[in-house]
Amino acid sequence: MKMMGWVGAAVLVAAGSCGAQRPAQGPMSDTKYTAESLGYSLFWHDEFDGDALDGSKWAIRGEGPRALGRVSREAIEVKDGYLTLKAFEKDGVVQVGMVGTQGRFMTKYGYFECRAQLQRGGGIWAAFWIQSTLIAKGEDPATFGAEIDIMEFFRKLGKDIVSHNVHWAYGPHQQTTHGMQSYLEGVSEGFHTFAVEWTPKRYTFFVDGYKFYEVHQGISRIEEYIILSMEPPQQEEISKMKLPDEYIIDYVRVYKKKGQDPKK
């Protein structure tokens, strides 16, 4: 992939972007990392090799109305080694797919990665994230956890930009790091990897192995679960949709440091 000299550079995100956004930036250096190069070993994974969602690992998340759409099992397909989260219209309502590991797999710390092909259109958006079950019960992220947005793709921000974020303390005093934007040419074409390294001191966000951001705020120190979602549109985004559309996931992998006890 061509880097086009964007190491450490910033690209201004188009007006009307999603909430408070930082300028998009290129990777922090030319170094390309893998989980293994950072000292991690595979701990949990799903390669989606079957012909149905593995119920021991995943469940449909929040089936029913969501924003101006509906989370539907009809929008979830496992076939030919891929999980596809679809977006399509049925009876005048946008149907989308969303799955999570809540109640099946929860952990803290490690290197979380997926390989995926992002959606083609706007309005809807693909996301790969981690969330605590306690996030709305208190304001201390160490105790109540956080929402860690490893990757979100809002096409209106630009076809070569993906977003990351951390939120905690759901409610009137919610805190956020504000949107971090990573620029990598061609990220909306074909398959790419999106990852976060979560430690007791920081979150580090990666795209295709390149390090883009380090965050030292909102650090969760409790177990959380993984979510893959195709998010339905908001009112102002309906006209930007091009349905049907899809978000295709090749794998999800979680790595741990060698000898690390995931319960500590």
Each model region followed by its residue ranges:
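GH16 jelly-roll
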Residues: 21-264
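Bacterial N-terminal signal peptides
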Residues: 7-15
